[in-house]
Amino acid sequence: MNTIDRKSRARFAAAAIVTIVLLACVARLFAGELKRLAAIELPGPSGLRFDYLTIDYDDHYLFVTHLGPGILYVLDLRMNKVVKTIEDLPGIEGVEYVPDLKKLYTSDWHEDKIGVIDLATLQVIKKIPTESKPDGSAYAAPFHKLYVSDEIAKAVAIVDVTRDEIVKTLRFDSETGMPQYDPVGKKIYVNLQDQNILATIDPATDSVVGMNPVGKCRGNHGMALDSEHRRAFLSCEQNSLLTVFDLEKNEPIAYLPIADGADVVKFDPGLKRIYVACYSGAISVFEEKDPDHYRKLGDVSVAHAVHSIAVDTETHRIYAPEQEQDGVPVARLVIYEASGK
């Protein structure tokens, strides 16, 4: 082989390597992107804070809480249209769908009550007093109980949904963050965000059966579960980490950087994607390669103050309410689709 051939082949090999690296980078960037599909203008006042969202897959409804004016929007996901506006829910934060009773429960901070909504009429039928700042909630279906974090009261209120009454209040030495129900382990998990602890509640006895440190995570507030693979995903708002927690070993196994102001976490098991809504103006996107390995796909730029999202696990669409755009007050819901799905 002459010198010219060797040099040509070397240049070709180098170019091929560069091309492969660039394609890999582009593929990774593309995989982390969210494609904006539509924006729905909401009828409430602009520039005021939104909070949790949840989906009723039976009726194809999306429920969006508008904390500022105390409004709940009901959207038909088949038409991408607001079909009902429910008012008189002062400071509404949390919202949880109870499918077996066709009811919806709201956490109404400004009056410290849990609202009960009949989905047949889309009317508020009862308000249940709590102690101080009801926030996130989780439904344990086999036990017919709703677990509501009473954040400032440092407690979890337990509601018997067959009677719509609080049957027990569990107290902690910490403000309580988002709870989640694990249908595989049949446990409720609650973030104790002042102590960096993940508490475990047994719904059969309504007793605390575990108090486990979350390692380097500081201010664990948001949470999503991959129950099948025994994993919890915790947003750490004080030090901008996503912590992956092993629910069998009761210990963290991975930490990944997220954008500032982390709040709500959602998991799409079909795409193996984890989404974290961050107040600074980003949705951090991660991939679960397998239960022990994770990688960050990117921080997708969205409007400032977007801190809550819903993920439709059937269509893989992401719903994010916006209260401002480039400093201009708005009230809208933006629909995204995951790229590379």
Describe each region flagged by the PLM.
Residues 1, 16-17, 118:
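Low-complexity intrinsically disordered segments
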Residues 1-10:
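N-terminal secretory signal peptides that target proteins for export/translocation
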Residues 9-14, 31:
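Sequence-pattern detector for short linear motifs
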Residues 14-28:
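Bacterial N-terminal signal peptides
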Residues 27-341:
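Predominantly soluble domains enriched in secretory-pathway, periplasmic, or organellar proteins
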